[in-house]
Design a protein with these regions (language model features):
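N-terminal membrane topogenesis motif
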Residues: 1-43, 200, 208-224, 403-414
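Signature of the first transmembrane helix
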Residues: 2-5, 22-77, 222-249, 372-377, ...
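Membrane-water interface segments that mark the loop-to-transmembrane alpha-helix transition
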Residues: 28-41, 66-123, 284-308
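Transmembrane helical elements of multi-pass membrane transporters/channels
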Residues: 29-41, 45, 164-165, 182-197, ...
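Helix-loop junctions and terminal segments of transmembrane helices
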Residues: 45, 49, 75-94, 262-285, ...
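Interfacial segments at transmembrane-helix termini and the short loops linking adjacent helices
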Residues: 58-61, 119-135, 311-343, 386
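Membrane-interface junctions at transmembrane-helix termini in multi-pass inner-membrane proteins
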Residues: 85-93, 139-160, 337-364
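Hydrophobic alpha-helical transmembrane segments
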Residues: 159-206, 371, 385-409
């Protein structure tokens, strides 16, 4: 009996050590992922874009932001969705690198052609069209490329991946100063990351080898890509609607006032990657109780992020875009709240994705997109940029409520 009791204590001790190590690993991985995103976005938002604002002015920067808006819509929609899809599908199908590499290539070419068609009057020369096409394709593969480190839970290399992008942006800026082409900033950054994953990883090896699961990858990936496409179009709705209805200066103004909030949204993305990486390794799905705990945690973190944004946004605008502060100060609170609710819904969607069919996410995203488009167009026409801000807030409130209801309805009992 004593021996049995001793064994039980020993097993309990080993179990606690194992849990402690796992928690430490999760914290370390979170630091690496958030550190990588902070570094990349810090270089962009604190160095590259403020310097471009001084070089170009609000009108030309608005043109650049519109083109980069197309990049921000298409590239994560294809690259990140297939990245996430691979983590989920691997549990049920023996997929290969080539299955996903081919899918990215097909979706990327079709999507890039569509994005060029949406560029309208913002691209003026054949070289600008070519540079935009190259930027779209390279960035799509870059968004997918970090799946190498998510599959293996190697978040130290994930950090280095984003370090390469940051260094590339800085190097590309010097090439921009010499050539006058801002495309070089982003082409160099994205290409350097792909070079790193090509050297350190295997995710692009066996590019042309497809398995019997290829059709599954196409089918599952298409639904998730469409869902991400709707989400990212929604996130960049300001650039599309304001560009069409008010012009490039309004695009720059809303970009500046929403920047801190959008950076918070970007920061939650790597946390989401860790969440889905660990949850998809489990055989059992979340219970209603576990999902609601996730909702509560998301609400708490979102409240803290909102307070931070309210303090940081005015300081940031005065420091880096002082010439625009007076024209945007009335937008700060409503815009920050809009972005933080977007952050919360993105986190909740990741939780829901682990125990529901991808089509549910697609339908909810589509409904939110249509609602936002209608409200934003009407609000902007009636009240200008302030009308757009309030319309966006209303749509995001409804989105958060809808995804919580879906999670409660679909999570297993317990």
């Amino acid at each position: 009996m004593k021996s049995t009791g001793g064994n039980e204590v020993q097993k309990a001790g080993k179990s606690q050590v194992k849990v402690g190590r796992q928690n430490k690993t999760i914290i370390t991985n979170t630091m690496y992922t958030m550190g990588g995103m902070l570094l990349m976005n810090g270089v962009l938002q604190l160095v590259i874009y403020p310097l471009l604002n001084r070089q170009m002015g609000a009108e030309q920067l608005g043109n650049l932001l519109y083109i980069m808006g197309l990049v921000s819509i298409l590239c994560p929609s294809v690259g990140q969705s297939l990245n996430t899809s691979r983590l989920v599908v691997r549990r049920d199908y023996p997929v290969t690198n080539g299955d996903y590499d081919w899918t990215i290539l097909i979706f990327g070419v079709v999507g890039s052609a569509a994005a060029l068609g949406c560029s309208g009057k913002e691209l003026h020369t054949p070289s600008a069209y070519l540079a935009t096409f190259l930027l779209l394709m390279i960035t799509i593969f870059r968004y997918y490329g970090d799946v190498e480190y998510r599959l293996n839970l190697n978040y130290k290399r994930y950090f280095i991946y984003y370090l390469m992008i940051s260094l590339g942006y800085l190097g590309g800026f010097f090439l921009y100063r010499a050539s006058g082409s801002w495309f070089l900033i982003f082409l160099v950054g994205e290409s350097l990351a792909l070079l790193y994953v090509g050297i350190s990883g295997t995710v692009f090896r066996g590019f042309f080898s497809r398995s019997a699961s290829f059709s599954v990858v196409i089918h599952r990936g298409l639904f998730l890509t469409l869902s991400y496409l709707i989400t990212n179009t929604t996130l960049n709705m300001d650039r599309l609607v304001l560009n069409r209805l008010m012009g490039n200066v309004a695009v720059t103004e809303y970009y500046v006032v929403s920047l801190i909030g959008k950076t918070m949204v970007l920061l939650i993305a790597p946390v989401n990657t860790i969440v889905i990486s660990y949850l998809t390794k489990r055989r059992e799905t979340l219970t209603k109780k576990q999902f609601l705990k996730g909702v509560a945690a998301g609400l708490g973190v979102s409240a803290l992020f909102f307070l931070f944004c309210e303090i940081a946004t005015p300081i940031f605008i005065r420091l880096f875009y002082g010439n625009l502060y007076e024209s945007v100060k009335g937008l700060i609170m409503v815009t920050n709240l809009t972005q933080i609710l977007g952050l919360l819904s993105a986190f909740l969607f990741i939780l829901v994705l682990t125990f529901t069919d991808e089509r549910w996410q697609l339908w909810l995203q589509a409904a939110h997109f249509v609602l936002l488009l209608v409200l934003a167009a009407a609000g902007t026409k009636a009240f200008g940029i302030l009308g757009f801000a309030w319309a966006s807030l209303a749509a995001n409130c409804l989105r958060v409520g809808a995804v919580i209801l879906l999670g409660v309805a679909k999570a297993r009992k317990g």
